[in-house]
Amino acid sequence: MLPSTIQTLTLFLTSGGVLLSLYVSASLSYLLYSDILLKFSSTKRTAPTMSLDCANVSNVQAVNRSATKEMTFLLPEPEWTYPRLSCQGSTFQKALLISPHRFGETRGNSAPLIIREPFVACGPKECRHFALTHYAAQPGGYYNGTRKDRNKLRHLISVKLGKIPTVENSIFHMAAWSGSACHDGREWTYVGVDGPDSNALIKIKYGEAYTDTYHSYANNILRTQESACNCIGGDCYLMITDGSASGISKCRFLKIREGRIIKEIFPTGRVEHTEECTCGFASNKTIECACRDNSYTAKRPFVKLNVETDTAEIRLMCTETYLDTPRPDDGSITGPCESNGDKGLGGIKGGFVHQRMASKIGRWYSRTMSKTERMGMELYVKYDGDPWTDSDALAPSGVMVSMKEPGWYSFGFEIKDKKCDVPCIGIEMVHDGGKETWHSAATAIYCLMGSGQLLWDTVTGVDMAL
């Protein structure tokens, strides 16, 4: 017996007496998805011209061999992405290790690329693991110079998250010694910076097309955030900065839509030095960023950007848990929240990600276990409160990388589940071979899942002497 939900569609195609009947079965289903309405576009398709050999075929009187018919189909358009509530969980666990140089004896196209500054960005269907390569592999004969931050060979590359960034796996997006990327729900936006220190250039690529540029405004190493930009409703927000590594470096935000810059945002507040921000959505209205001050303080500059008004303000985090490296003892900086304290010269990019819940918000941070060296990485959390005014200590939540292992840059990102977003933090674990040999990185990833305590730290398993 046929179900009552079966509909019969009879399509008559008449071409010299040809009659075809098509029966299409359709079941009805309904999907409630985050209050976002699925949009449809009307797209015309033309049936291809076919040459039909109808010899010895009964019930056919005549055939027009060049007949074409126009049909209109309704095809769904991909939706812009919006931040959603985080998936349930109360702790982070080790999710993934990408340690390319465990395969360092492999040669040819399967050889691992020499990389640094890795980060992850996610679209609705996949996450991609990005990095900046020196256009060299290990093993190989081009190790010299792979410890340098900027040169003419560096490129922004990516692989699907979980793949090893080898020569054959990697997509080379553009020449760049600083980079970012994000997905607006329909397409990838890629950002790369290169050029001379005194006149660097930001380049933007949307899908496969190179779409826009932005020139240096302080003529002192224009650079971007080395982590994912953030998109909402088709608008993507990118942090950039330009200025001295040991002095003034004022940041800006670029509002980008379909690969083209549509607005510049100039933050107010404590703007002396802000770089390498790790940003995410606190809500549908606000992007928050934990950044690096390489000149004046071990506190993190904290940005709040209102996406409704396109305004941004920066203040220092007030917590007595100082997140930069090097840093003084926790709680040792006296005075108001805007006090710089000592040991402010130098710094490191820090991990930061939001846990959005119906009744509260969690802010997760990472910092090195060492106060002076890029060694180890620990996870911290603070629920609710205001990072600008809350002086309480952050709660330690587990060791992701022990003091025996390298912990360099860290970053945040969110994986798109069917109905919620999974917050994650990634850690760059650098194999520092000095100037004489290769200099590259592994990536450790921890994500919110389940309850209990963070159970295990990560090791790279790489011996550079082998």
Swiss-Prot record:
Its main location: virion. InterPro entries: Glyco_hydro_34, Sialidase_Influenza_A/B, Sialidase_sf. Its EC number is 3.2.1.18. Substrate binds at residues 116, 150, 275-276, 292, 374. The active site is at 149 (proton donor/acceptor), 409 (nucleophile). The chain crosses the membrane at residues 9-31. GO terms for molecular function: exo-alpha-sialidase activity; metal ion binding. Disulfide bonds join 87-420, 122-127, 182-229, 231-236, 277-291, 279-289, 318-337, 424-447. Inhibited by the neuraminidase inhibitors zanamivir (Relenza) and oseltamivir (Tamiflu). These drugs interfere with the release of progeny virus from infected cells and are effective against all influenza strains. Resistance to neuraminidase inhibitors is quite rare. It catalyses: Hydrolysis of alpha-(2->3)-, alpha-(2->6)-, alpha-(2->8)- glycosidic linkages of terminal sialic acid residues in oligosaccharides, glycoproteins, glycolipids, colominic acid and synthetic substrates. N-glycosylated. It is a single-pass type II membrane protein. Residues 1-8 are intravirion. It is an enzyme of class 3 (hydrolase). Keywords: Calcium, Disulfide bond, Glycoprotein, Glycosidase, Host cell membrane, Host membrane, Hydrolase, Membrane, Metal-binding, Signal-anchor, Transmembrane, Transmembrane helix, Virion. It holds the Pfam family Neur. GO terms for cellular component: host cell plasma membrane; membrane; virion membrane. GO terms for biological process: carbohydrate metabolic process; viral budding from plasma membrane. Catalyzes the removal of terminal sialic acid residues from viral and cellular glycoconjugates. Cleaves off the terminal sialic acids on the glycosylated HA during virus budding to facilitate virus release. Additionally helps virus spread through the circulation by further removing sialic acids from the cell surface. These cleavages prevent self-aggregation and ensure the efficient spread of the progeny virus from cell to cell. Otherwise, infection would be limited to one round of replication. Homotetramer. Belongs to the glycosyl hydrolase 34 family. HAMAP family: INFV_NRAM. This is Neuraminidase. It comes from Influenza B virus (strain B/Hong Kong/8/1973). The gene is NA.
